[in-house]
């Protein structure tokens, strides 16, 4: 039986799916460790937390260097990769302990390993497409990222207008950063930003009201039951993206 665990630690509000309590505990510890390293680094370098521009980081914990590297490829500040980085840290910890199934939805930014097909539902705020469709994800024996940014849902800052921009990549940190970058500038009328997307991105699915944009190779889209109760949520409200 799949276990579903709600996890909160300061700004991190996540849902963890696994088959065993031990896997969930390991994933939680991975998240805590990642947050500790991040918070300790920000005390030393507050600009890392506030910059909207890419930064070159050569020293520090791996999570810091990896966030900076992903953000550099996307052309955004390093904190644009934070949710994907924390989700990745939790799944990576579980994988190192031998887990073959662990999914972490960190406020719409998902990292996973899965030995079975799963569905990831589309939540795009007030768009008529929201809650009606899902992405069918085949088994993934390596960590995979599905990250969503929105200009109309959630508390994260965005310069854009999209109801949702979902990015698929083997690198959850890069998926998170690119979702932010694309959401900031993509419109139905101007899709030129997609010409500059990093080659390590598999595909992008964006929603603007009743309209959508597909770029690259995205998973199969299937009909889905509207289950808002499965959306990762906390005191700050609902976030785009959900597990179903």
From Swiss-Prot:
Belongs to the UPF0280 family. InterPro entries: ApbE-like_sf (IPR003374), MA1715-like (IPR037456), UPF0280 (IPR007183). This is UPF0280 protein Mhun_0136. Gene3D superfamilies: ApbE-like domains. Disulfide bonds: none annotated.
């Amino acid at each position: 039986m799949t276990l579903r665990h709600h996890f909160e630690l300061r700004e991190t509000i996540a849902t963890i799916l696994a088959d065993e309590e031990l896997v969930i505990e390991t994933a939680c510890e991975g998240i805590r460790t990642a947050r500790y390293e991040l918070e300790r680094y920000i005390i030393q370098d507050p600009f890392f937390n506030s910059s909207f521009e890419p930064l070159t980081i050569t020293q520090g914990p791996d999570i810091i260097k990896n966030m900076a590297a992903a953000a550099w490829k996307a052309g955004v500040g390093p904190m644009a990769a934070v949710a994907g980085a924390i989700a990745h840290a939790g799944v990576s910890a579980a994988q190192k302990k031998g887990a073959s199934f662990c999914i972490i939805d960190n406020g719409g930014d998902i990292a996973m390993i899965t030995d079975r097909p799963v569905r990831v539902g589309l939540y795009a705020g007030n768009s008529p497409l929201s809650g009606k469709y899902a992405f069918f994800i085949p088994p993934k024996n390596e960590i995979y990222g599905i990250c969503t940014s929105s200009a109309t849902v959630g508390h994260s800052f965005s310069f854009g207008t999209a109801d949702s921009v979902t990015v698929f990549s083997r690198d959850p940190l890069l998926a998170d950063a690119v979702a932010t970058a694309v959401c900031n500038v993509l419109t139905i009328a101007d899709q030129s930003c997609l010409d500059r997307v990093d080659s390590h991105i598999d595909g992008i699915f964006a929603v603007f009201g009743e309209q959508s944009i597909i770029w690259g190779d995205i998973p199969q889209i299937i009909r889905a039951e509207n289950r808002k109760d499965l959306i990762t949520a906390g005191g700050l409200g609902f976030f785009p993206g959900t597990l179903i």
